[in-house]
Amino acid sequence: MVVGEGLLSAARFALRVVACGNALSLALKSNLGRSFSSFPAWAEYLIADSFENSGAFESDGGGGRITQRCALRPSGRCLRQRSLADARAEP
């Protein structure tokens, strides 16, 4: 009877492994349809951080600098924002 109990235990364990594998496969398959953009989310954050850290400065022709930043929209697309850095008010 000891051998029979061991085989029964091994069969139950094998069924649990298969069931967990099936559940994981279904979870991954259902999450694939939920992506809103072709870009992975971590890559969007890296791009946004690199734009913020680099600053991407250009001149406005009057001595000030125009700063461009990339902000993420809820849709996952990049929204470029321009602001005038070091702006001086003329009298």
From Swiss-Prot:
Protein origin, superkingdom: Bacteria
Name of protein: Protein YchS
Protein's organism: Escherichia coli (strain K12)
